[in-house]
């Protein structure tokens, strides 16, 4: 067994010695060749993309040009169409032109008439309104006494509630003609008693004055 293990170890050493790495320059050249091939591939791809975009732009421009030419041709054909004079289309074309000219004439006439009326009105206003002369006489100022006297007159004309009630009551008595009935009913009333006492006092005072005047 020991001899077999020794033989197996020797075989592994021989295999290890047989593998010899190559030079480093060979590996570096292989890497540089791979990088250059990748760069060439990228450049070719970019060039193809640029050419495709240019072709697309050229096709779009050609389409625009063709569309514009078609549109111009259609316009020319429409403008160059001949129409007979007695057809409905010619009448429809001529009518709006006439109507617009008539409207413009009417508007011009109205504007001229309005301007003439305004000028005449201004002339009449200048003629009717004479210039105001400045008067040398000054107006008197209102005195405070006049205002106070006017206020007093207004206060006198105003009636109290009692005075207004008496006037209304007297008017009602005259309208209904109840004077006799009221006198009979109010013989023994408070108001008549007060009036009787006032009359007696006035008569007594007059007698006293006459007695004083005597020698």
From Swiss-Prot:
Annotated Basic residues bias: 131-142
Keywords: Activator, Chromatin regulator, Nucleus, Transcription, Transcription regulation
GO biological process: chromatin remodeling; transcription initiation-coupled chromatin remodeling
Location of the BCNT-C domain: 139-215
Positions with biased composition (Low complexity): 23-34
Location of this chain's protein in the cell: Nucleus
Assigned GO CC terms: nucleus; Swr1 complex
Transcription as UniProt keyword: yes
Compositional bias annotation for Polar residues: 49-60
Region feature Disordered, mapped onto this chain: 1-153
Transmembrane domains' residue ranges: none
Secreted in keyword set: no
Family, per entry: Belongs to the SWC5 family.
Oligomeric form and interacting partners: Component of the SWR1 chromatin remodeling complex.
Described purpose of this protein according to its UniProt entry: Component of the SWR1 complex which mediates the ATP-dependent exchange of histone H2A for the H2A variant HZT1 leading to transcriptional regulation of selected genes by chromatin remodeling. Involved in chromosome stability.
Name of the protein in its database record: SWR1-complex protein 5
Taxonomic placement: Eukaryota, Fungi, Dikarya, Ascomycota, Taphrinomycotina
Gene field: swc5
């Amino acid at each position: 067994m020991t001899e077999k293990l020794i033989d197996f170890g020797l075989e592994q050493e021989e295999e290890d010695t047989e593998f010899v790495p190559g030079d480093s320059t060979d590996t570096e050249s292989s890497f540089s060749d791979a990088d250059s091939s990748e760069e060439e591939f990228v450049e070719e791809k970019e060039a193809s993309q640029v050419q495709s975009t240019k072709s697309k732009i050229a096709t779009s421009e050609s389409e625009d040009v063709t569309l514009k030419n078609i549109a111009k041709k259609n316009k020319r054909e429409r403008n160059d169409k001949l129409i007979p004079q007695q057809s409905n289309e010619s009448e429809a074309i001529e009518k709006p032109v006439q109507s617009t000219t008539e409207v413009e004439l009417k508007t011009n006439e109205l504007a001229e008439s309005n301007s003439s009326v305004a000028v005449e009105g201004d002339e009449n206003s200048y003629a009717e309104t004479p210039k105001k002369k400045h008067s040398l006489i000054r107006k008197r100022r209102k005195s405070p006494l006049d205002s106070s006297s006017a206020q007093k007159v207004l206060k006198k004309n105003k009636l109290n509630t009692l005075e207004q009630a008496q006037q209304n009551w007297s008017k009602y008595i005259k309208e209904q003609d109840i004077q006799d009935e009221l006198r009979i009913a109010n013989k023994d009333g408070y108001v008549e008693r007060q009036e009787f006492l006032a009359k007696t006092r006035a008569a007594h005072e007059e007698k006293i004055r006459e007695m004083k005047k005597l020698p």
